Regions:
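Edge/loop elements at the starts and ends of beta-strands within beta-rich repeat scaffolds
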Residues: 71-73, 100, 115-117
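A short beta-strand signature
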Residues: 100-112, 273-287
Length: 368
């Protein structure tokens, strides 16, 4: 019994703290929540408190610094990295309403400090919608960010880190490796985003991978098509580290096909519009030149406006297309946990699609 427990003892992981990934601190409001001018930041304190509560059977956290005598398997480091912070707002003038969306993208990174290679990465997207009568000030946004870090961010971080099965090596890995924007989708996205936004594809990859990971408890190799090299940068022990990313065995290709809205119902004072999002998702194994999954999906989101607001809806309705798309990502990723016949019937024309999700589920298991 003693030998058995030693053989399966959980790995020791060095706590690496909070880091910025592919986003510069100066381009965020998180920098005010992660202010270390007077010692530990609020994020530092929250993260340490949650790390201490972890009860994961596959690893235990050490707050010691790395030493030269550690074996390779004991040089895994955990870093919680902010990869993107997006704050958008729309104003619906007819209803005197401002909607603010805060979207935070993170990676829970486990990497080997001896060779700077990725062990596992768990993507996390946390979003919050705020309604107000006028645009929020920077001070108000910072307060809302603090609340997000104290609540939704740390709750999701804890749940993901506590339930994840960490291994020193994985037999198979999965990742989103290609984002294709068809003409309809690209025209829409370019119209509603900065023309020089080289990371626009990255945002779709982050969102889909976060839902896949959260709902299926799997690690996902970070998307790298918009990067110049197959690495990511992290800060650990006050130095920049370039972490090498493995090539996934299983590749997910996401094609965003387009967006469309239709008037569903019209009343005397209100209108209901359906905002549709359309995608194609493929799961392939390039080494075997094998396609395991290739299906088209659509999702409709019902939104009600006053007739006053619809006069100006072209200026703000893009946010509802993105809402529709994220619901599609979420529902798609849940089908490998439990089939939702109602959603599949409305989102896919393939009546035999349930068998395809069974195959995806088997592949996910190989990546755990």
């Amino acid at each position: 019994l003693f030998l058995t427990s030693k053989l399966f003892a959980n790995s020791e992981v060095i706590y690496g703290g909070f880091s910025y990934g592919s986003i510069l601190p100066k381009n965020t409001l998180t920098k005010y929540v992660h202010d270390r001018s007077n010692g530990q930041s609020l994020i530092d304190k929250l993260l340490i408190n949650n790390i201490k509560k972890l009860d994961n059977k596959s690893f235990k956290i050490s707050f010691d610094t790395l030493s030269d005598g550690l074996s390779e398997k004991d040089q895994n480091v955990l870093v919680f990295s902010l990869d993107n912070e997006t704050i958008n707002f729309i104003t619906i003038q007819g209803d005197n309403l401002t909607r603010t969306d805060i979207i935070l993208n993170f990676q829970i990174i486990f990497f080997n400090a001896k060779n700077n290679s990725l062990t596992a990465s768990i993507p996390l997207e946390v979003s919050k919608v705020l309604n107000s009568s006028e645009p929020l000030s920077e001070k108000q946004l910072i307060q809302e960010l603090k609340k997000m870090y104290e609540n939704e961010v740390m709750q999701n971080f804890f749940n993901l880190a506590n339930n994840f099965n960490l291994k020193n090596k994985y037999n198979s890995r999965i990742g989103i490796t290609k984002i294709i924007l068809e003409e309809n989708a690209e025209n829409f996205i370019n119209k509603n985003s900065k023309s020089n936004d080289i990371f626009k594809k990255n945002r779709f990859a982050k969102s889909l991978s976060s839902f896949l990971s959260y709902n299926n408890n799997i690690a996902v190799v970070p998307y790298g098509e918009d990067r110049t090299s197959n690495t990511i940068m992290l800060t650990f022990e006050n130095t920049q580290r370039e972490i090498k990313l493995p090539n996934p065995d299983y590749h997910i290709h996401l094609t965003v096909r387009g967006f469309k809205s239709v008037l569903f119902k019209e009343g005397a004072i209100d209108e209901q519009w359906i905002y549709g999002s359309y995608v194609k998702i493929q799961l392939i194994q390039p080494d075997l030149d094998k396609i395991y999954f290739e299906e088209k999906f659509k999702n409709g989101l019902n939104v009600e406006f006053s007739k006053r607001a619809t006069k100006n809806k072209n200026s703000f309705e893009w946010i509802f297309y993105l809402d529709s798309l994220k619901i599609l990502f979420d529902e798609f990723s849940k089908q490998t946990i439990k089939i939702d016949k109602k959603w599949l019937k409305s989102s896919s024309d393939n009546k035999k699609i349930k068998k395809s999700f069974k195959k995806i589920s088997e592949i996910y298991e190989k990546c755990k």
